[in-house]
Regions:
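Sequence/structural signature of beta-propeller domains
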Residues: 19-274
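Bacterial Sec-dependent N-terminal signal peptides
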Residues: 1-22
């Protein structure tokens, strides 16, 4: 893992801007708990979170499932996000709602579909955590993972402080102490994330009260930058729903998914234009 200098990121702007919902597709009931979104070979990939089948689903750009891939040998304890690089897909099995889990991991799978695939596990823990008793306001839950340079970066969902701590991991299998490299004062709890290396653009989804969800956009994001970041906040105009995944297309275009909130609704795939 590359040596990373500690930095603290401070929120210096939280202006709420307008945006437009350009496309809105209903997803199959199979994807009621969709919790990650990436693009591989011109298809979306997504997965369900806690307790569902250990499967990656491939969708077209209207949300229709066209393929699925079972991740044999692994359970879906709480798969919360996806990240990709040129060779691999990374599945974030790191949901930890009440700070009780001791089996956090990132599952590493090849991008290319092959019946002889072998999957690897990047197991980790937070060295700052010593108390694994049930906590309603958890500090070591996490739902956002990005691939950046030769590293994986975790954004925690700190309910107690309404911040996001940043932890870095290598991309190689093994057992690790995740290294804290900073904190992002989101003033909300982070539920998903994506990073575009060509644009140096970071996008996070977050919520304050679970009734409203937001996109947090940070430009010129880098592991080596120590300056304060300006965070632009955009309310997602879709009403009461649960948003846990985002994919950057360009500086102004994003796709998100939302979970099914009731028996009369369905999960959704949406395109948003700033």
């Amino acid at each position: 893992m590359n040596k990373i200098t500690l930095f603290i990121i401070v929120l210096i702007s939280s202006n709420c801007f307008s945006q437009k919902l350009q496309k809105d597709f209903q997803l199959s009931k199979i994807l009621d708990e969709t919790s990650g979104l990436e693009i591989v070979d011109d298809l979306f990939i997504t997965q369900n979170d806690s307790g569902n089948d250990p499967v990656i689903y491939y969708m077209d750009f209207k949300g229709k499932i066209v393929n699925q891939r079972k991740i044999t040998g692994f359970e879906n304890n709480d798969w919360e996000d996806l990240a990709v690089d040129d060779q691999f897909i990374y599945i974030a099995d790191m949901g930890n709602n009440y700070d009780t889990r001791k089996n956090l991991s990132i599952i590493k799978i090849p991008r290319k579909l092959d019946s002889n695939d072998t999957f690897e596990s990047i197991n980790f823990k937070y060295p700052e955590q010593s108390d694994f008793n049930y906590k309603r306001l958890s500090e070591f839950d996490a739902e956002a993972l990005i691939s950046i340079e030769n590293n994986l970066l975790i954004f925690t969902k700190n309910r107690a402080k309404k911040i996001s701590d940043l932890y870095i991991l290598p991309k190689t299998k093994g057992e690790y102490d995740a290294k804290k490299i900073g904190s992002l004062n989101t003033k909300s709890i982070v539920t998903g994330g994506d990073f575009n290396s060509e644009l140096n653009l970071l996008a996070l989804t977050s919520t304050i009260s679970f009734d409203e969800y937001y996109m947090l956009i940070i430009k010129n994001f880098s592991l080596s930058v120590k300056n304060d970041y300006e965070i632009d906040m955009y309310e997602i105009p879709i009403g009461k729903t649960q948003v846990e995944a985002i994919k950057i297309i360009d500086e102004n275009t994003f796709w998100i998914t939302s979970e099914d909130e009731s028996s009369s609704s369905s999960a959704r795939l949406m395109k948003i234009k700033l």
